[in-house]
Amino acid sequence: TYPANYQASQIIHAFSFSNPHIGFNLTIAGLTFLFGYLEYMYSFALVIKERSAPYPIWMHTFYFAHDSTGVVVFAIAAMQNHNFWLFWGASGALVVWNLFEVFNLYKAIYLERDAIWGSMYKDGHVPLKDAWLRVITQLCVMIGVVNLFRVFMNDPYMFKWFIFTNILMAIAPGMYWERRQTQVGASRGLAIVIILGTINSFI
């Protein structure tokens, strides 16, 4: 059965160096972060080379909201648990992810705004200030959604959310590529990385 709740002590035990399974746990955690970073490296490459990101704009705003919340949650957890190394490490890693998301949001606003929102305008051109307003509005909504569902899911340290974000990554980009009907901004290599990352999430 899926655990209805979990505590910081369980995480600390799993990632304490006295745990005989620490090697396995670190390997899986390391692979999880590696796949996550690779998914964004592909996004960087595609948006720079093809001027089109592989993920829809709402995924960027959602992941920014999720990861910025995680930065705060893990930093607080570290301070409440004798500066346990994993909590500080996770908080720092999520800061890096936030920087990735800022880059993607910047490119969405300055390079992709017509492709993203152009259908809403008669001439297909999206004013820069409108793009900024849409992104900021989405960010506010997503931050609210992430924190509201943390309460609903009884998810004090974001680990249930992490599983959901990996499932979302496995589903949403493929649907987005299919709707766009083009390989521009998509990649077979990225699809393979997403599949492997999703499998790793459930090991």
Predicted feature residues:
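Alpha-helical membrane-protein topology signature
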Residues: 1-203
